[in-house]
């Protein structure tokens, strides 16, 4: 009896050892100590990390940024045309004045928006500038996200909390994304990283 039990236990152990290990979730992408999970949920939809990188000003690390989409996209055009929910998540690596950040967004949108479309983004730009101008500063480690949900609009979250009104203009999110992905991006290597083309920016991002 004991021999049968022992043989059965041994066989079970061998079979368990041969069974494929459970698939483990991939480790988050880590940049300057900031971790970006490979998947997040936005308004009930699972999104995957399209790419992440660091925004530099000269040699100073300013913030990390990660772009989440329903499906991978490797060109600015594909990102802007992608259906479904989207998220841009930014974590500060140094302190920045809230009013200055709002002005930088406005300037970046102005530099990259089609000239004949820029005027219709002004109300949304003012809304977003207000979100940051009401904060004295964003410190290192603080974060903000910009979520887009079709049919609803663009919502800014600061440190994970929805801030300000939803920006209803459907094209506003794309106008905002052009700050990082447009013809005059905030940082060209960050643009490549957000598009998943990080090979040319890995050494700089470490």
Where are these regions (language model features)?
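Cysteine/selenocysteine-centered motifs that mediate thiol-based redox chemistry or coordinate metal-sulfur cofactors
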Residues: 188-206
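Sec/Tat signal peptide C-region and signal peptidase I cleavage site
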Residues: 19-23
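Short strand-turn-strand beta-turns centered on an Asx-Gly dipeptide
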Residues: 158-161
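Mid-length scaffold segments of soluble, non-membrane domains
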Residues: 72-151
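Flexible glycine-rich active-site/ligand-binding loops centered on an Asp-His dyad
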Residues: 165-188
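N-terminal secretory signal peptides
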Residues: 24-82
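A short, compositionally biased
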Residues: 33-36, 148-152
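N-terminal export leaders
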Residues: 3-11
């Amino acid at each position: 009896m004991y021999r049968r039990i022992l043989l059965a236990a041994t066989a079970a152990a061998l079979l368990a050892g041969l069974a494929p290990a459970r698939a483990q979730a991939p480790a988050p992408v880590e940049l300057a100590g900031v971790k970006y999970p490979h998947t997040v949920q936005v308004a009930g939809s699972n999104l995957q990390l399209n790419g992440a990188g660091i925004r530099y000003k000269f040699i100073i690390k300013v913030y990390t940024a990660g772009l989440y989409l329903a499906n991978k996209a490797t060109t600015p055009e594909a990102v802007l045309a992608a259906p479904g929910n989207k998220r841009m998540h930014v974590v500060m690596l140094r302190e920045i004045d809230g009013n200055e950040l709002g002005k930088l967004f406005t300037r970046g949108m102005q530099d990259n928006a089609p000239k004949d479309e820029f005027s219709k983004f002004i109300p949304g730009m003012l809304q977003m500038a207000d979100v940051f101008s009401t904060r004295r500063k964003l410190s290192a480690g603080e974060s903000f996200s910009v979520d887009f949900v079709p049919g609803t609009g663009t919502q800014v979250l600061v440190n994970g909390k929805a801030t300000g009104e939803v920006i209803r203009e459907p094209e506003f999110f794309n106008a905002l994304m052009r700050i990082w992905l447009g013809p005059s991006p905030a940082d060209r290597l960050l643009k490549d990283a957000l598009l998943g083309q990080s090979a040319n920016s890995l050494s700089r991002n470490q």
